Amino acid sequence: MARQTTVSAACDLGGPPLLWDKLDRMRDCASRWHHNAVTYAYPAGNDRPERRPLDVVAHRGASDDAPEHTLAAYRKAIEDGADALECDVRLTADGHLVCVHDRRVNRTSNGRGAVSTLELADLAALDFGSWKAPTGEHEAPDRDPERDNREHTSVLTLERLLELVADSGRRVELAIETKHPTRWAGQVEERLLALLGRFGLADPPRDDPSPVRVMSFSARSLHRVRAAAPALPTVYLMQFLSLRYRDGRLPAGVDIAGPSIRIVRNHPEYVARLHRAGNRVHVWTVNEPEDVELCARLGVDAVITNRPKAVLTQLGRR
């Protein structure tokens, strides 16, 4: 436990806190999450304000402007006004949840190897951002270049992302995707729910919309989540439209569909089918203006995009 706390702190921008300071900070973050969720909650009954026809979710952060899954990308998405942040989580060899999409780190870092075979300290030594040059709008006289560089290049733990959202001062939702298959099987969901529990997010009140939802292409993963945390919303992601769910039904206990934009383009009537079955619809990855327009016209509930600022501007919300 002592090693886990020390390693986790090594990836923290604020330096290594003592164990009791870390626990106090987590309790404080849980309080701020609750404050933001309640103060800026949607109206009762999951009804969304009429002024917002669909939610804009930042895919791996504002990943068109900053390296994906870095603190810089998520900070930019919050500054741009994204309603929610999307992240992928994987389990390291020493049991930490990190925000990395690929099974291996080769594409997004200067290292090699599978995330599941590397410890957090190994990942903390890698550069996860220099492959993507930051845009000019991040350069401001009052910014700390050293901090900015760390935020653009350091591996991001889910714990640190939860802290960032807690500090946002407004309601920012989080869509967390579990990556499968994995050598850790159900341990990913177990560790995820334990971490959410420490932030007071694993058991949201049934009469309030949860600020966190869990997504996966794996129905088995979602079943594990629903069994352990039945009040937590789950999203069934779909790359292709299978015959099994063509009528609008979803796996048991799931009430949010996550079809790809390709499915929506090829089968626009599917959105209405999902809605008739009582499901919400979150579409990924929606970057092009014509796709944003299509989703708005069809009445989807959320679009997941690499370009939250551009989408919000197109929707007249900036």
Task: Give the location of each predicted region.
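Phosphate-group recognition and catalysis centered on beta-loop-alpha active-site segments
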Residues: A2-V7, C11-L13, L18-R318
